[in-house]
């Protein structure tokens, strides 16, 4: 199957972590024998001037790729504006909603209207969790599948707990951007309540200076790391924490489980579909005491956890790629007109 991949997030030499889950899924589709061509944006294609130009270029590149590659189907990531590029190709398309793109609908009537147009003209929509699918509330007649981007269990394997030579107690790890939504400030407050252990923070963002200034004793900032660097930090940790105010799915969560690590995750969003008391704790992200209690509960679980590894295996990249391939194949078998007019049973665009 000839697939044209369109995404506004994709890794580069400067930002190897940026949209790496999209790239890995594309590679998994290639490994299944598909011919996948990429038309993508990178982290540098951002800013009030750069962004419109980048999307205009993305549209031109997508149309040129259609003429040259003649894809059977377009596989797009993120609803708007990437979905508008998919529409312009006039090829049947499947689009994945990741969460932030769904939140954007609530912030702007214009984005909401454009998103509905993208949904109605799609052959299918893939959501990374049941939570995202519920938040999306796709119009009647739109096919919705729930498939996350998968975790590379061939690369991320369970490793024994590293020896605590300094006797400092549990080693907690946070992986993600340093923004309000990720709730790292409350994680730091919860960690301070424990009175022991270490907390390593991997990632960067606008709150880094503030978080460094208020970090309790035992906190270490590791900065933005490559995928291999993240894997190395997971191997050193006992518990990986993801206490976001809202988390659509949680890629770092699956990576931690694949390494056999216990997790602490927000109960608001997709993690509630994965995390059980046998592999971690779900917490109230607004309650520091709840986060602290979850950290203690997770720290008491075995490391490496075979149950965590088993759960991660259900989301292994080859399994998810096979599911995505099936959705793409169904879309490719349909009329090309799917890509240029509303689906049967859906209301006309407004």
PLM ranges: what are they?
Residues 106, 151-165:
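Acidic anion/phosphate-binding donor-loop and adjacent secondary structure
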Residues 277, 281-288, 297-302:
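Conserved acidic donor-binding segment of nucleotide-sugar-dependent glycosyltransferases
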Residues 119, 224, 232-237:
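Short alpha-helical donor nucleotide-sugar binding micro-motif in glycosyltransferases
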Residues 4, 164-200:
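Conserved donor-binding/catalytic core segment of Leloir-type glycosyltransferases
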Residues 245:
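Aromatic "clamp/platform" in nucleotide-sugar-dependent glycosyltransferases that forms part
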Residues 209-228:
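Nucleotide-activated donor-binding/catalytic signature segment of Leloir-type glycosyltransferases, i.e.
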């Amino acid at each position: 199957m000839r697939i044209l991949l369109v995404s506004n997030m994709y890794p580069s030499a400067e930002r190897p972590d940026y949209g790496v889950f999209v790239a890995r899924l594309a590679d998994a589709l290639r490994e299944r024998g598909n011919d996948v061509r990429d038309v993508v944006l990178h982290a540098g294609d951002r800013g009030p001037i750069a962004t419109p130009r980048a999307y205009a270029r993305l549209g031109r590149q997508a149309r040129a790729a259609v003429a040259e590659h003649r894809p059977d189907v377009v596989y797009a990531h993120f609803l708007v504006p990437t979905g508008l590029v998919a529409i312009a190709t006039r090829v049947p398309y499947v689009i994945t909603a990741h969460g932030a793109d769904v939140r954007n609908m609530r912030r702007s009537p214009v984005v909401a209207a454009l998103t509905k147009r993208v949904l109605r003209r799609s052959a299918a929509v893939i959501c990374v969790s049941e939570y995202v699918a519920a938040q999306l509330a796709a119009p009647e007649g739109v096919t919705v599948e729930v498939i996350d981007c998968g975790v590379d269990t061939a690369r991320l394997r369970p490793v024994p707990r590293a020896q605590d030579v300094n006797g400092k107690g549990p080693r907690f790890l946070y992986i993600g951007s340093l923004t309000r939504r990720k709730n790292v400030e409350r994680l730091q407050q919860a960690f301070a309540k424990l009175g022991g252990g270490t907390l390593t923070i991997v990632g960067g963002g606008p709150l880094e200076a503030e978080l460094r200034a208020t970090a309790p004793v035992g906190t270490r900032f590791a900065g933005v790391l490559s995928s291999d660097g993240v894997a190395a930090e997971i191997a050193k940790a006992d518990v990986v924490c993801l206490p976001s105010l809202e988390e659509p799915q949680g890629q770092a969560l699956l990576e931690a489980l694949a390494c056999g690590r216990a997790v602490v995750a927000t109960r608001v969003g997709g993690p509630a579909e994965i995390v059980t008391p046998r592999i971690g704790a779900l917490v109230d992200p607004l309650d520091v005491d709840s986060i602290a209690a979850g950290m203690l509960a997770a720290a008491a679980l075995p490391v490496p956890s075979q149950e965590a590894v088993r759960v991660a295996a259900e989301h292994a990249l080859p399994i998810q790629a096979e599911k995505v391939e099936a959705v793409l194949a169904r879309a490719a078998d349909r009329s090309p007109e799917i890509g240029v007019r509303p689906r049967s049973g859906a209301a006309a665009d407004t």
